[in-house]
């Protein structure tokens, strides 16, 4: 083989090595493109317990916080008037509530959110709840602590803050609390934060959480986190899961499967940490290519 052929092959190899690979920045920009459609339902591990009713209004896609707030308020007022006129004594169902700072809290019913505002200067929090007495917007704030959400699908989100402040400056990125049930978190990127994701929030409300907090985590990417980097809870929940991989660090039915943990520090006793490491090694042994493929596929 001629020397020129060797040179040509060498240059080709160098060019291939120098070619840029997909980075997390590229992946983050592709979140909306790869997100589920408005008609999809979660199917990871276990589908949500019920599909959206045919009577629900069509979902709305918003990208700016003012439009988001006005949409929530308008549908909350319409739902309040309709509910009061039809069945004033029934146990009504509120689908979601939005809290924006410094705006007052708003509760909306039968409203589906796809794209959340991304402005870091504002705080947008969705707290779906199923037990609200919808009376007037002023009185709605009285019921903000009755958070018993169920049938919630969190899909294709990029959640982060920064690590420039101390651990108590921010709270959790994605917390599932107050007897929430049948919550599915898929294809979500949690990164650059102190407290990542928590299931259950306190030992003092064990009676509220018992028998609830059924949460599925699938195909998520956790990076550069300090604590709560795995589903962890102090709530007294009853484990009812029968799926292939179960996080047994706590008594919460949280399923963890095909999730990648990188530069993440787990705050757990040594005995529990050892059990988690054995579970992770077993999972990696059965899916040896996960660490190479998941970062490009997760979002």
Swiss-Prot record:
Region (Disordered): 82-105, 227-246
Superkingdom classification of source: Eukaryota
Catalytic activity: Eliminative cleavage of (1->4)-alpha-D-galacturonan methyl ester to give oligosaccharides with 4-deoxy-6-O-methyl-alpha-D-galact-4-enuronosyl groups at their non-reducing ends
GO molecular-function terms, A-Z: pectate lyase activity; pectin lyase activity
SUPFAM superfamilies the record matches: Pectin lyase-like
Cellular component terms (Gene Ontology): extracellular region
Family matches, as Gene3D superfamilies: Single-stranded right-handed beta-helix, Pectin lyase-like
Keyword RNA-binding: no
Pfam families: Pectate_lyase_4
Alphabetically ordered keywords of this record: Lyase, Secreted, Signal
Amino acid composition bias (Low complexity), ranges on this chain: 82-91, 232-246
InterPro entries: Pec_lyase, Pectin_lyas_fold, Pectin_lyase_fold/virulence, PEL
Disulfides per UniProt: none
Record keyword Zinc present: no
EC number(s) reported in the record: 4.2.2.10
Signal peptide location: 1-18
Family, as annotated: Belongs to the polysaccharide lyase 1 family.
Name assigned to this protein: Pectin lyase
Protein's organism: Peyronellaea pinodes
């Amino acid at each position: 083989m001629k020397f020129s052929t060797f040179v040509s092959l060498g240059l080709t190899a160098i060019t291939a090595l120098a070619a840029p690979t997909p980075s997390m920045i590229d992946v983050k920009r592709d979140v909306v493109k790869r997100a589920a459609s408005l008609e999809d339902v979660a199917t990871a591990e276990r589908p949500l317990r019920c599909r959206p009713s045919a009577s629900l209004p069509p979902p709305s896609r918003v990208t700016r916080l003012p439009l988001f707030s006005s949409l929530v308020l308008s549908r909350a007022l319409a739902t309040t008037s309709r509910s009061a006129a039809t069945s004033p004594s029934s146990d009504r169902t509120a689908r979601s509530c939005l809290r924006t700072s410094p705006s007052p809290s708003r509760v909306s019913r039968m409203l589906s959110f796809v794209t959340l505002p991304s402005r870091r200067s504002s705080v947008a929090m969705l707290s779906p709840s199923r037990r609200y007495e919808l009376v007037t917007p002023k009185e709605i704030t009285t019921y903000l602590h009755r958070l018993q959400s169920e049938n919630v699908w969190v899909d294709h989100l990029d959640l982060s803050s920064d690590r420039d402040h101390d651990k108590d400056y921010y709270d959790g990125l994605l917390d599932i609390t107050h007897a929430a049930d049948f919550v599915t978190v898929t294809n979500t990127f949690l990164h650059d934060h102190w407290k990542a994701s928590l299931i259950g929030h306190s030992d003092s409300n064990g009676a509220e959480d018992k028998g609830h907090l059924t949460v599925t985590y699938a195909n998520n990417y956790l990076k550069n986190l300090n604590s709560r980097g795995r589903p962890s809870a102090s709530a007294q929940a009853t484990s009812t899961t029968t799926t292939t991989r179960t996080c047994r660090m706590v008594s919460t039915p949280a399923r963890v499967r095909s999730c990648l943990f990188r530069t993440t520090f787990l705050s757990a006793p040594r005995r529990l940490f050892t059990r988690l490491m054995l579970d992770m090694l077993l999972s990696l042994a059965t899916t040896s290519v996960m660490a190479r493929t998941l970062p490009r596929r997760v979002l």
